[in-house]
């Protein structure tokens, strides 16, 4: 499956619509590639799990793969459905992203020039389908106690507004179990991360 291993290829589209100059870029049997995107400046970015985590990479001017921001978190996810996006370009130098640590999504701004990640205070723990402009980012969001919603982040003020809820049912947070992050050993000395509901 693509979350186990897949390949990223690049080609040029001729005036007649044919693909030309097709070449392999990254990936393979044991490397998963997620969400290839062209930056506004025409640089190819993508997430790769080559270091054990889906981290953001890009192709340099010399054609080499560069790690953009190494972290022990996921900037990617299994593609159970198509069209998911965990990051979006607000500009050449700013990426809005949702990186996952211990099974929980964290909304953040990645400053490409200064290599700094600014986490945004956010009530949501599941953030997907990010899209961005120079002023705003929109995304689908939810949490164990919040119904799914479309939310908007103001990139200047960092304010998050809920634009639309999936339904208008009243939610009572006390009725819901809150999952806890867990980790456990797996094969080859690796560690798996997830969420657990513990009932006592």
Predicted regions and their residues:
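A flexible loop/linker signature enriched in serine peptidases of the S9 family
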Residues: 1-10, 24-34, 46-58, 70-81, ...
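Short loop/turn segments that connect beta-strands within beta-propeller blades
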Residues: 13-17, 60-63, 111-115, 155-156
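Beta-propeller fold detector
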Residues: 20-26, 65-72, 118-121, 160-166
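Hydrophobic beta-strand positions that form the internal "hydrophobic ladder"
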Residues: 44-45, 95, 137
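Signature of short aromatic-glycine-proline-rich micro-motifs recurring in repeat-based ectodomains
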Residues: 81-90
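An N-terminal hydrophobic leader/cap segment in hydrolases
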Residues: 144-182
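Conserved small/polar residues in nucleotide/adenosyl-binding loops
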Residues: 198-200
């Amino acid at each position: 499956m693509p979350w186990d291993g897949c390949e990223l290829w690049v080609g040029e589209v001729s005036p007649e619509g044919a693909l030309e100059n097709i070449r392999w870029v990254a990936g393979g049997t044991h490397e998963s590639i997620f969400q290839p995107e062209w930056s506004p400046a025409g640089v190819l970015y993508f997430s790769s799990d080559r270091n054990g985590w889906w981290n953001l990479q890009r192709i340099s001017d010399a054609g080499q793969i560069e790690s953009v921001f190494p972290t022990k978190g996921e900037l990617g996810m299994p593609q159970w459905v198509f069209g998911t996006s965990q990051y979006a370009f607000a500009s050449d130098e700013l990426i809005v992203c949702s990186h996952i640590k211990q099974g929980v999504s964290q909304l953040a701004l990645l400053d490409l020039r200064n290599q700094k990640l600014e986490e945004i205070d956010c009530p949501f723990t599941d953030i997907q389908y990010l899209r961005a402009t120079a002023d705003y980012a929109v995304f689908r969001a939810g949490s164990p106690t919040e119904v799914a919603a479309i939310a908007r982040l103001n990139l200047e003020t960092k304010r998050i507004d809920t634009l639309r809820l999936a339904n208008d049912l009243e939610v009572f947070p006390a009725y819901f179990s809150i999952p806890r992050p867990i980790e456990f050993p797996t094969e080859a000395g690796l560690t798996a991360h997830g969420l657990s509901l513990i009932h006592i």
